[in-house]
């Protein structure tokens, strides 16, 4: 797909990976609508991007949003949504575990209602994460959700052809989700990535490059693209 003059919607487009994706799409000449829940973050968007507020768990709001935006060529969701239940499964609060799946429900809502406006040559990209296939102790909830997202994409790809759908799976990425600052932040990432083949945290723009690849390459669908610094092999 030649991205120039194509119309794109990016959920989670005001921060981290989503924001970097918006920036790269704009640079490539796309018309971009960035979706988020915090209007105050609209000022972070690059010139040319439009902000719209929406919660991916609100199905009626999503239907209205897609109807308002009209026909699109590119649909990206990097919205995290929900909580992240952490800890041993045998001790886990099951309400917290279930709440972690809000990310999955958000993604499925976005795809379900976005498909109605997506062109036949269009592309969808969702963001999962390495815990889907590399689950450390205490990551059962995150792994379950990520695995479900990737399985969802493989199944849906068969149903929506010639439209395409893929997942991009980041490793540990330096995003605003981590509240640490300065030396503490550097030490945090250094400790967690020490055994990676590329021993550092990734940058949001590096993940966005993977998303752009999945959009541009018309021969890729129903798969997961890893952007993880070799974490899966470590």
Where are these regions (language model features)?
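Conserved NAD(P)H cofactor-binding loop of Rossmann-fold oxidoreductase domains
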Residues: 78-86, 229-230
